[in-house]
Amino acid sequence: MPTCARRRTSSGTTARPKQVPLTHANLCASADNIRKTLQLTPEDRCMNVMPLFHIHGLGAALLASLAAGASVVCTGGFDGLRFHSLLAKVQPTWYTAVPTMHQVIVDRAPRDIDAARTNPGLRLIRSCSAALAPRLMSDVEKLFGVPMVEAYGMTEASHQMAANP
């Protein structure tokens, strides 16, 4: 029987929250799926603003990057006031966040417009963990001039199950 690598608590959107055991194979398969979806390579650098106790931060930002041999810069959490300056400093090729974070990023952009436009290496942005409004997706893509990948997942599936290019 496979050993449990991590136990996660589901969000409980369809029933009461429950403990979900994830095996090493679950986590590796999910990381590889995300790596393939995003076409990550060793040249990529992820700026991780998601907490590592959340499957989004652990699976998508950290493990998918490591599966590609890419680098990850963990910011210590999301800070809307510092996001654009961190983006300019870290110079990632991608980042992943939840829609509420993307909204803060868009809302702060007029105040941080110089920093928002100083990352020529940014090649994609990922959103997951909640529904993304089409308008917000468009606003983020216009702000950064790169495509946004909208992913869908669930804790029980080790995170990402599908993604829109």
Residue ranges and their predicted role:
Residues 1-9, 16, 39-45:
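Conserved pre-ATP/AMP-binding loop-to-beta segment of ANL
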Residues 28-45, 55-93, 108-109:
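Conserved AMP-binding/adenylation subdomain of ANL enzymes
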Residues 5-29, 164:
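Conserved AMP-binding A3 loop
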Residues 92-97, 106-165:
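Gly/Ser/Thr-rich phosphate-binding loop
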Residues 40, 50-54, 130:
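Conserved AMP-binding
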Residues 79, 100-102, 132:
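Alpha-helix capping/helix-boundary segments
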Residues 1, 21-23, 98, 133:
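GHKL-family ATP-binding catalytic core of two-component histidine kinases
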